[in-house]
Regions:
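Mid-domain, small-residue-enriched loop/turn segments at the edges of structured enzyme/sensor domains
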Residues: 8-11, 107-181, 185
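Acidic helix-start/capping segments at beta-turn-to-alpha-helix junctions
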Residues: 59-73, 110-111, 133-136
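Active-site SXXK
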Residues: 34-62, 249
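Structured C-terminal helix/loop/strand segments within mature extracytoplasmic catalytic/sensor domains
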Residues: 1, 24, 169, 178-282
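A short, well-structured edge-of-sheet supersecondary motif
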Residues: 1-29, 240
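Conserved catalytic neighborhood of penicillin-recognizing serine enzymes
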Residues: 69-106, 112
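Flexible glycine/proline-enriched surface loops and loop-helix/loop-strand junctions
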Residues: 27-29, 86-90, 97-102, 157-165, ...
């Protein structure tokens, strides 16, 4: 696993666990990491956990004017007209296409304090929510200055990039992330119909180039969430086999190359995850 990641030019902290047993593998699993868009897992879990407790209605419609939307390359972030969507449909966009604008509407309705309370209740002591995605984008733009975001990828750049520093924003660990996923899949994070809805939403991600690339089988289901920001390439999710066994996976990586397009690095995450799951399956 380490050889695969190293040859692809990735530094990684990762953790893989059997959802229903004690078997686990990892390296640097307790190191704090800047989670980028993987943090949307914690956000949508808090939404549906609040729904299960009767404190929020995910079917409630929200008016979404164009002004004030957070920047991004997908979903509402690139739409040019006003819209009206429910909170659960916004959650679907936040997971399926990593829509930053949709996620920030959820932050506004669920609340940063509520997400932090949720992860504390679930025992995730090293996970902290500290900023909306619009604030994250603004910090990148401020750090880049006139050179633009591309300047931040230059290995020789002396600029401190706050978005890459776990202490500056949303953060977690690989072990906390797999713990969250295991609790979600066991129905411990959110029970009942809203727990089923949470599982449905987390199975909607469209990207297949990282975690899912390591499991190209029609009878193996992969649910996940990517995170991409400058040199960061993350993915976390659950791999479910037809024999009923299931595995929570979290890979937080940083590329050594400044290139934005690195398909070999992306696929290495899937390959390493497959090797880890195969080892747990014996």
């Amino acid at each position: 696993m380490e050889e695969v990641l190293t040859e692809a030019g990735l530094l990684a902290s990762w953790h893989v666990r059997d959802v229903d047993a004690e078997a686990e593998l990892g390296r640097g699993a307790d190191a704090p990491v800047a989670t980028a868009s993987v943090h949307k897992l914690f956000l949508v879990t808090a939404l549906f956990r609040e729904a299960a407790a009767g404190r929020i209605d995910p079917t409630a419609p929200v008016e979404l004017p164009v002004p004030g939307r957070s920047p991004g390359r997908t979903g509402l972030s690139v739409m040019r007209d006003a819209a009206r969507l429910s909170l659960r449909d916004l959650a679907s966009l936040a997971v399926a296409v990593s829509d930053n604008a949709a996620a920030d509407v959820l932050w506004d309705h669920v609340g940063m304090d509520t997400v932090n309370r949720t992860v504390a209740e679930l025992g995730l002591r090293r996970t902290v929510s500290a900023q909306r995605y619009g604030e994250l984008a603004a910090s990148v733009a401020e750090d880049a200055g006139e050179g633009g975001a591309a300047a931040l990828l230059d290995p020789a750049s002396p600029v401190r990039v706050r978005a890459l520093d776990p202490a500056s924003g949303n953060r977690s660990t690989a072990r906390d992330t797999t713990a969250l996923l295991a609790k979600v899949w066991r129905g411990e994070a959110c029970a009942g119909p809203w727990g089923e809805e949470l599982l449905r939403v987390l199975g909607l991600q469209t990207w297949q180039h990282r975690l899912a690339s390591g499991f190209p089988f029609d009878d193996v289901r992969v649910s996940g969430k990517t995170g991409s920001l400058l040199s960061l390439r993350h993915e976390a999710g659950v791999v479910e086999y037809p024999d009923g066994r299931r595995y929570a996976v979290a890979f937080y990586t940083r590329a050594l190359s400044p290139a934005l397009a690195q398909p070999r690095a992306d696929s290495a995450i899937g390959t390493a995850a497959r090797l880890a799951v195969d080892a747990l399956r014996g």
